[in-house]
Structures are given as structure tokens and as C-alpha cells.
Regions:
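Domain-level signal for Mg2+-assisted phosphodiester chemistry and nucleotide/NA-binding surfaces
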Residues: 1-103, 107-111, 160, 166-167
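Nuclease catalytic cores that cleave nucleic-acid phosphodiester bonds
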Residues: 83-216
Length: 216
């Protein structure tokens, strides 16, 4: 009997670890990525994607629109559950890395944009699925060491399998130590897991969603 498997995708971590450097990879078919990564003796019963909606940024004027197109594409393709956090803007005072001169002020007033709740939402979803006995195997796509606590709980208390696929190129020794199985995602793997350039939907396929040209 195949193991019931749920895949949890940390969108923020995946983006900065694997997708940001290659615009074409942003048009990623998350379901297909999960199917490629998960061993064949497992049955994927859910793929859960945790992300936050981008706020308008004059430095990246198309980012919000492109993300909305992508989220609609995922919805139309199906097979993905999306849970959203949010971005929070904060005024902050930060020190210069190097003091410019002895008489200069060593701090600058900056605006910090921080992604909130995605990691908490992911960890909470794992715990709920564990306690409701929704899965035998838990697969996490993230390099965030903050997830060690739920990983340990599910492994040690529940005696379930927890697999971590790290989207970053660097090794996360902490995650590797705590997971049942750990692997860094190959840098070229997203090229095999992209959505179609055009996704048709509607009763007769009369409507369509297109990959943003900047992501081609």
C-alpha cells in the first residue's frame, strides 16, 4: 500500500532559493514539481502552497500583476491548495555595514518589507494534518530551519516520515539532521516542471491565461 503523502511548499523560501535568479522558472507547475520529487511508492493526496500577495512596488511595477496571473494559473490547473500570508511594511533604523566616516551618523532610516505568516501557516497545516491522520509521509519544500520543531514532533511523537527538499544551493545542516530524508533540489529541475505557456479554461476553453513575457 502506498504511503499517503502531503507536500508543503514554502513559496517565499522556494522563490529566493531557486526561482528568483531565473525568470522562466517562476512559471512553475508546483504539482508537477511535487510529483517529480516524491518517490513512486508514495501517493500524493495534497499539495499545499504557502505564499503572500506582493504589494505594489514602483521598483518592480509588474510584480503584483505577474503574481496574480500565476496564482490564477495555478487555480485553473488545479491540484494545489493555496494559503496566503501577507507582507508588512515597517520603518526601521539600520546600521551601516561600514561606518562611512568618524563624524557621520552610522545609521540610516530604511523601509523594511517582511513576509509574514507563511512559515507559521505551513507549520500549523502540518500539525493539523498529523493530528487528523491525513498523511503517513510529510514532504516539505523549504530551507527554513524554523520548521525543525514540527518536524521533530511529527517524527518522534508520531513516528511518521518527514522529507525535506531544500530549494537553496547551500546545505542546511540543521534540517538534514532532523529530517528522515534530506536533499537539495537540483538547480535545473524547475525547467522540467513548467506550466504550459497558455492555459485554457471556461466551459468551451474560450478563455486563457498566458505566461508573462518577462517570465519567458
Amino acid at each position: 500500500m502506498k504511503k499517503r503523502t502531503i507536500v508543503y511548499i514554502d513559496g517565499f523560501n522556494l522563490y529566493y532559493g531557486l526561482l528568483r535568479s531565473c525568470p522562466a522558472y517562476k512559471w512553475l507547475d508546483l504539482r508537477k514539481l511535487a510529483e517529480v520529487l516524491v518517490a513512486p511508492e508514495n501517493e500524493i493526496v495534497a499539495v499545499k502552497y504557502f505564499t503572500s500577495r506582493v504589494n505594489y512596488d514602483p521598483k518592480r511595477p509588474t510584480a503584483k500583476e505577474h503574481q496574480e496571473i500565476y496564482l490564477r494559473a495555478l487555480q485553473k490547473v488545479g491540484g494545489i491548495e493555496v494559503t496566503e500570508g501577507y507582507y508588512q511594511r515597517q520603518d526601521a533604523r539600520m546600521p551601516f555595514r561600514f561606518e562611512p566616516c568618524k563624524s557621520c551618523r552610522p545609521y540610516a532610516d530604511v523601509i523594511r518589507i517582511e513576509e509574514k505568516r507563511s512559515d507559521v501557516n505551513l507549520a500549523t497545516a502540518m500539525m493539523v494534518d498529523f493530528h487528523e491522520d491525513n498523511a503517513d509521509s510529510f514532504v516539505i519544500i523549504s530551507g527554513d530551519a524554523d520548521l525543525i520543531a514540527p518536524i521533530d514532533y511529527i517524527r518522534k511523537i508520531g513516528r511518521r516520515t518527514v522529507v525535506v527538499f531544500n530549494p537553496h544551493a547551500s546545505l542546511s545542516g540543521d534540517l538534514k539532521k532532523h529530517a528522515t530524508f534530506y536533499k537539495n533540489i537540483p538547480r535545473d529541475l524547475p525547467a522540467q516542471c513548467l506550466l504550459p505557456d497558455m492555459i485554457r479554461y471556461g466551459k468551451h476553453g474560450e478563455r486563457s491565461i498566458h505566461r508573462p513575457p518577462a517570465w519567458a
